[in-house]
Amino acid sequence: MAEKKQWHETLHDQFGQYFAVDNVLYHEKTDHQDLIIFENAAFGRVMALDGVVQTTERDEFIYHEMMTHVPLLAHGHAKHVLIIGGGDGAMLREVTRHKNVESITMVEIDAGIVSFCRQYLPNHNAGSYDDPRFKLVIDDGVNFVNQTSQTFDVIISDCTDPIGPGESLFTSAFYEGCKRCLNPGGIFVAQNGVCFLQQEEAIDSYRKLSHYFSDVGFYQAAIPTYYGGIMTFAWATDNDALRHLSTEIIQARFLASGLKCRYYNPAIHTAAFALPQYLQDALASQPS
């Protein structure tokens, strides 16, 4: 039996993970990026950019449920949602499940990524691009939040790691723009990497966000594809109460929403804000 081809992730120099490649569906390598989508028997379709896994069919639901339902149910009455990035459509898919949301704006810098993901990752968007509440804006995320006249109740930054094109979505200019177009009491969330291996990224986000929001913290979820520990999500708002809502309040909102999830539930929501001591200590050591 012929040995299967392997794809190795290159995010870290000293260690990593690999996937067996059953079938390469797409591979484009240019001076600017290396994009590949392949099939793996354990994880389904896998998309990687510049040597780093971005999403897989098998476990994407964990990431996307936690990035949408945590802020939306904590807010309680969000009407207008902004997604920065998210061209694969899975974040949009989860937001559309909230029937009280009236408008969903997605800002994607690459016009081709939506059609590309429609073709190669159809299970991610599950038809959500056709939702009448959805509007796609082709623009740089930093430019959009600093120029738009729209305001939002929840902003979800579905950014890549802070290298290359994704670096601008971890800057003070971006965070300031997000604060500018958030409605009072609005919530901003963003992926912040695997904290055990990328702690400096979390601390940097904490410092910068604290200049613009009165309540800044993190919540976490275990996502197998993002190896090295627990995935960390930044949380920022000026409504200090929203991070500390009781499980009973979240439970009532969850039941009223009619959501049926595979990972998220009200107990997970509450528990996600319990941070490991090493991260608590690192955040506590930052100047106020």
UniProtKB/Swiss-Prot annotation:
For S-methyl-5'-thioadenosine, which residues are the binding ones?
33, 108, 140-141, 165
Give the PROSITE patterns listed for this entry: PABS_1, PABS_2
Q: Which UniProt keywords apply?
A: Cytoplasm, Polyamine biosynthesis, Spermidine biosynthesis, Transferase
Indicate whether Cytoplasm appears among the record's keywords: yes
Q: Which GO terms describe its biological process?
A: spermidine biosynthetic process
Q: What's this protein's family per the entry?
A: Belongs to the spermidine/spermine synthase family.
Q: What does this protein do?
A: Catalyzes the irreversible transfer of a propylamine group from the amino donor S-adenosylmethioninamine (decarboxy-AdoMet) to putrescine (1,4-diaminobutane) to yield spermidine.
Official protein name in the record = Polyamine aminopropyltransferase
What species does this protein belong to?
Shigella sonnei (strain Ss046)
